[in-house]
Curated annotation (Swiss-Prot):
The active site is at 82 (nucleophile), 169, 171. InterPro entries: Class_I_gatase-like (IPR029062), GATASE (IPR017926), GMP_synth_C (IPR001674), GMP_synth_GATase (IPR004739), GMP_synthase (IPR022955), GMPS_ATP_PPase_dom (IPR025777), NAD/GMP_synthase (IPR022310), Rossmann-like_a/b/a_fold (IPR014729). HAMAP family: GMP_synthase. The lineage of its organism: Bacteria, Bacillati, Bacillota, Clostridia, Halanaerobiales. This is GMP synthase [glutamine-hydrolyzing].
Length: 510
């Protein structure tokens, strides 16, 4: 008997984990495995359904990731998304894939041409496309069920085999009825019940941590953010006093952040906390460094070195807890995924690290972590705190870093946070922060010519950090932020607002 579990096979798509997340939103357990998993392993997992993810390769190319054709003989429903649909087409008899004359990227209008279980209750609506190849001919026994103005086969299905394919991405929020399409696949095609929840995930993860760690000592790095707080709390629930938390003040934090971390984690969590003042050490290492990737690598390496030194003082700590999220993993790249930038929690770690990593949140997105934080009973000021990168203000200062620039950025960032909270937008916005570019501009203040730094205000809305849109803040709020910054922050004479979405930009500037 098949279990209420969905297997997502990852072909290197940037949205692979997002698929699994959407499945979990439907209260169905999901796991991700690489595309080259063996048939025996799939049988052992015994899923109720399989989803082929998208991917950056061409199914017609020599480096196309393939799967054993035996997967189609397992009598398990399959949904192919983007590359996954093209792969299904290429491997099944009668199907053909071709390079389209024009690619299709971004929003498109889906026209449903034939109703099946996948499209029950679904009407013509906006979907999100990202492809160049397209299905030329559907496999034997399949019917074309949807199209767009550019793509004649935007969806296909074989109800008898329970094989379905969509060229668009139902997992992203820009596909208006995408979650309902996924629900149809889960409940109408696969027949799952939908009884899994976050409490189950917490219990499973706590059991896994107990088994992995045994009686070993563990250290955790606290930053004050929700990720490290939730990760540390989960580990503490699993192993208790075997965990010691360490807070490294690298001098790249926001205003008042170090004090808040020490106060909150000692008082709220009652977990032993070691405070390390490493501000001078980090700034010395970063002196003269301009390249953002080099900054990240230096900070990641120095962070681990500090941890190793503190661990030796504490005793034999074998494990390091990190609040790595899946969005971090995606942007750092994998075997089949493209690298966007290395993350302090992933690609910024040195190879010669003395710790084994515990990353209980590695397969989760930020909003899921917040749900777990609420289940664990963490305070709102931690659960709803906006994301802050591991390298801190180092990647919000373009170019070289020094004490003066850090002070300018801290003051400007503090004003932004104060005003956005006061206006009631803090929880609605995914991130809001200041960026200090490596340039100056001419201004006039008090009838005197000035030559000062501009501050870039970045505020975005998002559900998961995979995509983001610039926040439509009221003009009055923008004016208030700008006025306060140029009047209260020395050496700043201009404020500009970044209105770029992700993609093409990333949320952070570096």
């Amino acid at each position: 008997m098949k279990e209420d579990k969905i297997l997502v096979l990852d072909f290197g798509g940037q949205y692979s984990q997002l698929i699994a997340r959407r499945v979990r939103e439907c209260n169905v357990y999901s796991i991700i495995k690489p595309y080259n998993i063996s048939i025996d392993q799939i049988k052992d997992i015994n899923p109720a359904g399989i989803i082929f993810s998208g991917g950056p390769k061409s199914v017609t190319g020599p480096e196309a990731p393939m799967i054993d054709k035996e997967v189609f003989k397992l009598n398990i429903p399959i949904l192919g998304i983007c590359y996954g649909m093209q792969l299904m087409t290429a491997l099944l008899p009668g199907g053909a894939v071709e390079k389209a004359r024009h690619g299709e990227y971004g929003k498109a209008r889906l026209h449903i041409t034939e109703k099946d279980k996948l499209f029950e209750g679904i009407s013509d609506s906006q979907v999100w496309m990202s492809h160049w190849d397209r299905v030329k001919k559907v496999p034997d026994g399949f019917k074309v069920t949807a199209k767009t103005d550019i793509t004649p086969v935007a969806a296909m299905g074989n109800p008898e085999l329970k094989f379905y394919g969509v060229q668009f991405h139902p997992e992203v929020v820009h596909t208006i009825q995408g979650l309902n399409i996924i629900r149809n696949y889960l409940f109408k095609v696969c027949g799952v019940k939908g009884t899994w929840n976050m409490a189950d995930f917490i219990n499973e993860e706590i059991d896994r941590i107990k088994e992995e760690v045994g009686s070993s000592q563990v250290i955790s790095g606290l930053s004050g953010g929700v990720d490290s707080a939730v990760a540390s709390t989960m580990v503490h629930r699993a192993i208790g006093d075997q965990l010691t938390c360490i807070f490294v003040d690298h001098g790249l934090l926001r205003k008042g952040e170090a004090e808040q971390v020490k106060r909150t984690f000692v008082d709220e969590f009652n977990i032993p906390l070691v405070y390390v003042d490493a501000r001078e050490r980090f700034l010395n290492r970063l002196n003269g460094v301009k390249d953002p990737e080099t900054k990240r690598k230096i900070i990641g390496e120095e962070f681990i070195r500090v941890f190793e030194e503190e661990a030796r003082k504490l005793g034999d700590a074998r494990y390091l807890v990190q609040g790595t999220l899946y969005s971090d993993v995606i942007e750092s790249g994998s075997e089949t995924a493209e690298t966007i930038k290395s993350h302090h929690n992933v690609g910024g770690l040195p190879d010669n690290m003395d710790f084994k990593l515990i990353e209980p949140l590695r397969n989760l997105f930020k909003d899921e972590v917040r749900k777990i934080g609420e289940v664990l009973g963490l305070p709102d000021e931690i659960v709803w705190r906006q994301p802050f990168p591991g390298p801190g203000l180092a990647i919000r200062i373009i170019g070289e870093i020094d004490g003066k620039k850090l002070e300018i950025l801290r003051k400007a960032d503090s004003i932004i946070q104060e005003e956005i909270k006061e206006a009631g937008y803090y929880k609605e916005i995914w991130q809001s922060f200041a960026v200090l570019p490596d340039l100056k501009s001419v201004g006039v203040m008090g009838d005197t010519r000035t030559y000062g730094y501009p501050i870039i205000l970045r505020a975005v809305t998002s559900d998961d950090a995979m995509t983001a849109d610039w926040a439509r803040l009221p003009y009055e709020l923008l004016e208030k932020i700008s006025t306060r910054i140029v009047n209260e922050v020395d050496s700043v004479n201009r404020v500009v607002y970044d209105i770029t979405s992700k993609p093409p930009a990333t949320i952070e500037w570096e």
